[in-house]
Amino acid sequence: MENILGLMSKDDWIYTGLLLFSFGASCYVRKIGNNILASGALGFAMSLFIIGPKIVYSLGICSIAISIQLLANKKSTPLYVFLTTFTYLMFVRFAHYILPVNEVASHTNVIQLIITLRIIGITFEENDAWVHKSDENPTKRYLTELPTILEKFAYFYHFCGLFTGPYYTYQMLIDSQNPILKSWDPTLEVKSRFVRLLWSVPVFVITNHYFPLDILRSDAIWEVSFFTRLVYAALIFVVFKTRVYSAWAIAESICVILGIGIYPAASNPKIIMGPTDLNAFDKLKTRENIEMSSDAIVNLDIPKVEFSDGFRDGMKAWNRSVQTWLALYVHSRVKVMRVETTMLVSAVWHGTYAGYFMSFGVVAMCAILEDVIFKLVPVDTETGVRPKWFRILYTHTIRCRGFEMLATGFLLKNAYDVHHFWSSIYYWLPLLCIPFYIYSAKISKPKKAQKSE
């Protein structure tokens, strides 16, 4: 038994238990009618069981956010809720340094993260519906039903995705109540995800056992060659990816069973956006026995994560629901330094560890680096792709080795530990990016000046 338990950390075993329990619960909830309020109550009960009195952290921001939504000026509500929610998130993370309270960590932090996304998301959903309520021919779907206070709490604590993601909108939760989904069979969708587990779980367990993260924290990493350090970083990244591949295979299956993110395939659904072909959706939403798609809830595009040509495509394929949340509510709404601001918000959302800011800060520079390099080596007009030699060279040097380095910063978290390992590989990625970042900043200023003239 000890050997089996030793294959994963205590937190990993708890997450595994939560996912398996949630999977079983989703089957039962679907059977009894897929009630949103009951699912919210179940999620709250699970949270209370796992984190106990620490649940007051999430209850606090839920109550504050709803109060702002009720009392603030409608036009300014999204901004107030966004700033308040992130300020609160930072406060509770540092509260244990100044107050006699428990630290927000592990499962408590994950619940706080997911609820943060849901609070801000539903605020923007309500506001966008209010702004566009008089549109005669809307080009996108807006919230079709305004939630009550109780329904908001049920959404915030809905057990589906509460401990691992993916993020989904309140409108997607409403859409899951579509009566035709009761007769739709999710077996094939679930089966395809469980096939993934047949390879992702064994790879995770084996690599996690033989290549522990603590090696990067030890002085032993300095006793091996530079090449070996890069190989070890690559293996740590495999551990990280396969853990996530496995967890989200089950998490997506739970969504699918409950009908969250399931739409007619002809309506061209997109991640957390839902159907984008509104005419097709209106025609097909009440029809049975048609092809359905789960694209709106697919949180990973594994082929692109593994084989895309660049940083941008790789990042977009990873944790797609959060990436889209950031694109909708941060990137598209700020006027300057969009990539940098988006990465800053992403780092703050993940936590206060220096490793998050170091990794996401370098990601922003990597995007600029890639833009400059891709301009220097343009796409061939005949083939539609860049030269093969370049794709092989770029993918297997900057792109892959870069993602692996960034992953170590994300996982090591502590500034000392990140520096300990990154210095052993000579900070090669940031040092490579900085000149390109400065170059890009300089050449962009004249263009902005010309536009203003």
UniProtKB/Swiss-Prot annotation:
Pathway info: Lipid metabolism; phospholipid metabolism
E.C. number(s) listed in UniProt: 2.3.1.-
Localization terms from the record: Membrane
Residues carrying covalently attached carbohydrate according to the record: N319
GO MF assignments: lysophospholipid acyltransferase activity; O-acyltransferase activity
Entry annotation: catalytic residues: H350
Tissue: Expressed ubiquitously throughout development from early embryo to larval and adult stages. In adults, strongly expressed in pharyngeal muscle, body wall muscle, vulval cells, distal tip cells, intestinal cells and spermatheca.
Any one GO BP annotation for this protein: nematode larval development
Deletion phenotype: Mutants show larval arrest at an early developmental stage and egg-laying defects; 14% of mutants accumulate unlaid eggs that hatched internally.
Impact when changing H350A: Disrupts LPIAT activity
UniProt membrane topology term: Multi-pass membrane protein
Lineage, highest ranks first: Eukaryota, Metazoa, Ecdysozoa, Nematoda, Chromadorea
Protein function: Acyltransferase which mediates the conversion of lysophosphatidylinositol (1-acyl-sn-glycero-3-phosphatidylinositol or LPI) into phosphatidylinositol (1,2-diacyl-sn-glycero-3-phosphoinositol or PI) (LPIAT activity). Prefers sn-2-LPI rather than sn-1-LPI as the acyl acceptor. Lysophospholipid acyltransferases (LPLATs) catalyze the reacylation step of the phospholipid remodeling pathway also known as the Lands cycle. Involved in the selective incorporation of arachidonoyl-CoA ((5Z,8Z,11Z,14Z)-eicosatetraenoyl-CoA) and (5Z,8Z,11Z,14Z,17Z)-eicosapentaenoyl-CoA (EPA-CoA) into PI.
Pfam families in UniProt: MBOAT
Keyword annotations of the record: Acyltransferase, Glycoprotein, Lipid biosynthesis, Lipid metabolism, Membrane, Phospholipid biosynthesis, Phospholipid metabolism, Transferase, Transmembrane, Transmembrane helix
PANTHER family xref list: LYSOPHOSPHOLIPID ACYLTRANSFERASE 7, PORCUPINE
EC primary class: transferase
Family, per entry: Belongs to the membrane-bound acyltransferase family.
InterPro entries xrefs: LPLAT_7/PORCN-like, MBOAT_fam
Organism: Caenorhabditis elegans
This protein's GO CC annotations: intracellular membrane-bounded organelle; membrane; mitochondria-associated endoplasmic reticulum membrane contact site
Stretches that traverse the bilayer: 4-24, 36-56, 79-99, 154-174, 195-215, 220-240, 244-264, 354-374, 421-441
Catalytic reaction annotation: 1-octadecanoyl-sn-glycero-3-phospho-(1D-myo-inositol) + (5Z,8Z,11Z,14Z,17Z)-eicosapentaenoyl-CoA = 1-octadecanoyl-2-(5Z,8Z,11Z,14Z,17Z-eicosapentaenoyl)-sn-glycero-3-phospho-(1D-myo-inositol) + CoA; a 1-acyl-sn-glycero-3-phospho-(1D-myo-inositol) + (5Z,8Z,11Z,14Z,17Z)-eicosapentaenoyl-CoA = a 1-acyl-2-(5Z,8Z,11Z,14Z,17Z-eicosapentaenoyl)-sn-glycero-3-phospho-(1D-myo-inositol) + CoA; a 1-acyl-sn-glycero-3-phospho-(1D-myo-inositol) + (5Z,8Z,11Z,14Z)-eicosatetraenoyl-CoA = a 1-acyl-2-(5Z,8Z,11Z,14Z-eicosatetraenoyl)-sn-glycero-3-phospho-(1D-myo-inositol) + CoA
Name of the featured protein: Membrane-bound acylglycerophosphatidylinositol O-acyltransferase mboa-7
Coiled-coil regions listed in the entry: none
Superkingdom in the source lineage: Eukaryota
